[in-house]
């Protein structure tokens, strides 16, 4: 799920509140996996018996899923399963066991810098109209400010709400890096060059939220971001924060 910053009473210091293993698109609408066939629901289990959607990801090839490191820290691979080819979070499609979790070696649990990970499936991910590898941004991908981007996921439709059983999507916009950095300094957050901010700045009401963590952010059908963290969800002043995929292209290609 997406990590949120919580304000400490009567001061501007903040902490990264590590969420429960669960996080929805705010302000979006329902869609289908046929429209976003690279999307995958990542299922977590506390007891290794019952698995439910907790994070999202994007299919990279027949064996690998791109997601966010913070979803998996401290977890054995058998606590996670991968659902591909389904519009629904907890039914349909094909469910794969996870063979390996690869966390970026420079992931920082405090700042959430380098918040990127790859899950390897124990079985082959078949390709069809409901499950297809995503295109990812190259190292020189040019993404300007105020560009329309699309987020998808099964996360909360409002802060503190339950997840959405049906896949949802929302159009938001890229936010200037310096603007995002200065806004988050107000609440103790650190925006690095490895991060990409998106939302509806100074308006709010549209965002990724808890349960959308690890899910892809698309620009012209290319994955440019991986849902990471933010100050609550869909606030006008504070956009959502993603891992910037173009900063990790070589690492993704080497490990996928």
Swiss-Prot record:
Residues 1-17 form the signal peptide. Residues 18-24 form a propeptide. Disulfide bonds join 55-71, 180-197, 209-233. The record marks 207 as: Required for specificity. It comes from the Eukaryota. InterPro entries: Peptidase_S1, Peptidase_S1_PA, Peptidase_S1_PA_chymotrypsin, Peptidase_S1A, Trypsin_dom, TRYPSIN_HIS, TRYPSIN_SER. It is found in: Secreted, Extracellular space. It is an enzyme of class 3 (hydrolase). One of its GO terms (molecular function) is serine-type endopeptidase activity. GO terms for cellular component: extracellular region. GO terms for biological process: proteolysis. Gene3D superfamilies: Trypsin-like serine proteases. Pfam families: Trypsin. The active site is at 70 (charge relay system), 115 (charge relay system), 213 (charge relay system). It catalyses: Preferential cleavage: Arg-|-Xaa, Lys-|-Xaa. Residues 25-256 form the Peptidase S1 domain. Its EC number is 3.4.21.4. Keywords: Disulfide bond, Hydrolase, Protease, Secreted, Serine protease, Signal, Zymogen. CDD domains: Tryp_SPc. Responsible for the activation of delta-endotoxin from Bacillus thuringiensis. Belongs to the peptidase S1 family. This is Trypsin CFT-1.
């Amino acid at each position: 799920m997406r990590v949120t910053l919580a304000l400490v009473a009567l001061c501007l210091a903040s902490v990264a509140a590590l969420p429960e293993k669960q996080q929805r698109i705010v302000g979006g609408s329902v869609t289908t996996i046929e429209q976003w066939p690279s999307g995958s629901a990542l299922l977590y289990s506390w007891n290794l018996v019952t698995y439910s959607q907790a994070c999202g990801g994007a299919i990279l090839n027949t064996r690998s899923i791109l997601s966010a490191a913070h979803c998996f820290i401290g977890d054995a691979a058998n606590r996670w399963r991968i659902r591909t080819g389904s519009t629904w979070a907890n039914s349909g499609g094909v469910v794969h066991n996870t063979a390996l979790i690869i966390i970026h070696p420079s992931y920082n649990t405090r700042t959430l810098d380098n918040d990127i990970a790859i899950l390897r499936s124990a079985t082959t991910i078949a390709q069809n109209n409901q499950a297809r590898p995503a295109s990812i941004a190259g190292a020189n991908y040019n993404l300007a400010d105020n560009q329309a981007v699309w987020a998808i996921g099964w996360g909360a439709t409002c802060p503190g709400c339950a997840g959405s059983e049906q896949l949802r999507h929302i159009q938001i916009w890229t936010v200037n890096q310096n603007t995002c950095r200065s806004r988050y300094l107000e609440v103790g957050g650190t925006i690095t060059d490895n991060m990409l901010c998106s939302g509806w700045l100074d308006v709010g009401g549209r965002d990724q939220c808890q349960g959308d963590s690890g899910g892809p952010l698309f620009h012209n059908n290319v994955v440019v971001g991986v849902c990471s963290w933010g100050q609550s969800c869909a606030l006008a002043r504070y956009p959502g924060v993603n891992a910037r995929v173009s900063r990790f292209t070589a690492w993704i290609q080497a490990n996928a």
